[in-house]
UniProtKB/Swiss-Prot annotation:
This is tRNA pseudouridine synthase B. The gene is truB. Responsible for synthesis of pseudouridine from uracil-55 in the psi GC loop of transfer RNAs. Disulfide bonds: none annotated. InterPro entries: PsdUridine_synth_cat_dom_sf, PsdUridine_synth_N, PUA-like_sf, PUA_sf, tRNA_psdUridine_synth_TruB, tRNA_sdUridine_synth_fam1_C, TruB_C. Pfam families: TruB-C_2 (PF09157), TruB_C_2 (PF16198), TruB_N (PF01509). It catalyses: uridine(55) in tRNA = pseudouridine(55) in tRNA. It comes from the Bacteria. The active site is at 67 (nucleophile).
Length: 318
């Protein structure tokens, strides 16, 4: 236990040092999306600050936090790409996770204290598939106390650390896919595709309860966010080995979070109007969201109304 806390304190020092360093370097207006493979142990904000420092970016934001003990895909939006980060926050996510059966912890994962132990029933694939089928599709999920959700302005995890538990309302989430990858006498390996707002820790706990023995997560690895898939080699260590030009080549376009949307070219003579946020005419059918280009340069996001009006919604300063 002491070794665990030493690791956490050391990681905190690393994040503190990175934040201090970041205020001393010269910033630049770099824009794009980096598909970071987040390491074990660091917070999402900690790796965000390090990536921002390595790119010397003026602005940066992540697109859905991972707990320190979770690993995998954490898209980092730099500069103008932050204008589209909410599309990734709201997107479907895919995870690979391991659930240890027979033990319930305070946090729903290995960080917490074991508060209950029960025997695990004999497991068969047919039995497990029957239980898992109850968690596929639209379900109700009670958020955990150890979460960043707030009550009266205070994060629930602060209350939980004080031993306070309050009633939480169940919320609707969708489990698009739940695959049993492997299992043994006391653990399950699952592949989960889910909607935003889904807590995989709670899913693991609920599956354990449905089996009558309880459970908690021992590993959580995100492999997909929206249409972005994990690139295993895109680690912090890999970034550190590259020079600035090489790092910039790894960035996706600032509009990459929405590059699946239809695209149109700005009509001749309408560039000034669009860049000033003004509506203009366009000979195009109505589209709720469309990317507007001048040649290969993306100007931003717009709506085309049924009256054939091009209405700017989000402009890119590139």
């Amino acid at each position: 236990m002491n070794e665990f806390f030493n690791i956490i304190f050391n990681l905190f020092d690393v994040e503190h040092i990175m934040t201090a360093k970041s205020s001393k370097i010269s910033r630049r207006p770099v824009s794009g999306v980096f598909l970071l493979n987040k390491p074990l142990g660091l917070s999402s904000n900690g790796v965000l600050q390090k990536v921002r420092w390595l790119f010397r970016a003026q602005k940066a934001g992540h697109t859905g936090a991972l707990d320190p003990l979770a690993t995998g895909l954490l898209p980092i939006c730099l500069g103008e790409a932050t204008k589209f980060s909410h599309y990734l926050l709201d997107s479907t996510k895919r995870y690979q996770t391991v659930v240890k059966l027979g033990q319930v912890t305070t946090t729903g994962d290995v960080e917490g204290k074991v508060v209950q132990s029960r025997s695990v029933p004999p497991l068969t694939r047919d039995m497990l598939e029957l239980v898992l089928d109850g968690f596929r599709g639209d379900i109700q999920q009670v958020p955990p106390m150890y979460s960043a959700l707030k009550r009266d302005g205070r994060p629930l995890y602060e209350l939980a650390r004080q031993g306070i538990e309050i009633e939480r309302e169940a919320r609707p989430v969708t489990i698009h896919a739940l695959k049993l990858v492997d299992f043994d006498t006391e653990s399950l390996t699952l592949d989960v595709t889910c909607s935003k707002g889904t807590y995989i820790r709670v899913l693991g706990e609920d599956i354990g309860e449905a089996l009558g023995c309880g459970g908690h997560l021992t590993a959580l690895h995100r492999v997909q966010t929206g249409h972005f898939e994990l690139v295993p080699e895109y680690t912090l260590e890999y970034l550190e080995q590259l020079n600035e030009t090489e790092r910039d080549m790894l960035l996706l376009a600032p509009y990459a979070p929405v590059d699946y949307l239809p695209q149109v070219q700005i009509p001749e003579g309408r560039l000034k109007y669009f860049c000033n946020g003004q509506e203009s005419n366009i000979d195009h059918d109505a589209v709720p969201e469309v990317l507007v280009f001048e040649g290969e340069r993306c100007l931003g996001l717009a709506e085309i109304t049924d009256k054939k009006r091009l209405v700017p919604k989000r402009l890119l300063n590139l």
